[in-house]
Amino acid sequence: MDSNTVSSFQDILKRMSKMQLGSSSEDLNGMITQFESLKLYRDSLGEAVMRMGDLHSLQNRNGKWREQLSQKFEEIRWLIEEVRHRLRITENSFEQITFMQALQLLLEVEQEIRTFSFQLI
């Protein structure tokens, strides 16, 4: 995994945790949780690609890995839409910058997961 991506995840999660969005703090906490889950999933796919012998054990352990992959792409799309929505409604420049960086990171992670999954297929 790229060290810049790791620091980007950590930076965005820190920034999001500092935001006060009033009544929508539950939504923000949900986004943070999904970001963390997405990072872990992307990392595990990357590790499986690096150890191609693990592909068979991954498939044996979890015959539904393609379903999980599809679910992760749905989560990414939801997060992208949520971040875009937040970006449109916020007037705070700190939040705008954070959400713009989060959007860029999501698009990068989506591409990485696609690349990893094609290598595993």
UniProtKB/Swiss-Prot annotation:
Quaternary structure note: Interacts with protein M1. May interact with host nucleoporin RAB/HRB and exportin XPO1/CRM1.
Keyword Phosphoprotein: no
Matching SUPFAM superfamilies: Nonstructural protein ns2, Nep, M1-binding domain (SSF101156)
UniProt source species: Influenza A virus (strain A/Hong Kong/156/1997 H5N1 genotype Gs/Gd)
InterPro entries: Flu_NS2 (IPR000968)
Subcellular location: Virion; Host nucleus
Pfam family, one: Flu_NS2
More details: Average number present in a viral particle is estimated to be 130-200 molecules.
An example Gene Ontology CC term for this record: host cell nucleus
Its job: Mediates the nuclear export of encapsidated genomic RNAs (ribonucleoproteins, RNPs). Acts as an adapter between viral RNPs complexes and the nuclear export machinery of the cell. Possesses no intrinsic RNA-binding activity, but includes a C-terminal M1-binding domain. This domain is believed to allow recognition of RNPs bound to the protein M1.
Protein name: Nuclear export protein
Annotated keywords: Host nucleus, Host-virus interaction, Transport, Virion
Disulfide linkage: none
Family: Belongs to the influenza viruses NEP family.
